[in-house]
Regions:
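Glycine-/charge-enriched secondary-structure boundary and capping motifs
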Residues: 1-99
Length: 99
């Protein structure tokens, strides 16, 4: 999404919803091998700055629950999040960064 659009995504890894205990497991180094393959494939496009390594590992983790990332104009973000929450879906909605 970012590369094709010629933009940069700035994510706050602490705002990303993770599975319960995922951060603690990552701190212990319990990361699947596929995460390292993903990092090798797309790492050239990512500047992790001073992000703690365990969060970086989680971002490359190939195990997902069907997560969805959408981008909306800043002035529409609150309304979109409210709409998701009103639907009563069993999902987490979070504003995790900016374009």
């Amino acid at each position: 999404m970012a590369t094709a659009s010629g933009v940069c995504l700035n994510l706050d890894v602490r705002k990303i919803p993770y599975f319960a205990d995922a951060v603690e497991y990552a701190k212990m180094g319990l990361i699947p091998a596929g995460a390292y393959k993903n990092r090798g494939h797309s790492g050239q496009y990512v500047d992790v700055g001073n992000t703690p390594e365990h969060y970086v590992d989680l971002l490359y983790d190939p195990q997902t629950s069907g997560g969805l990332l959408i981008s909306v104009a800043p002035e529409q973000a609150d309304a979109v999040m409210e709409d998701f929450e009103k639907k009563g879906l069993d999902t987490k909605v979070a504003m995790i960064g900016e374009v």
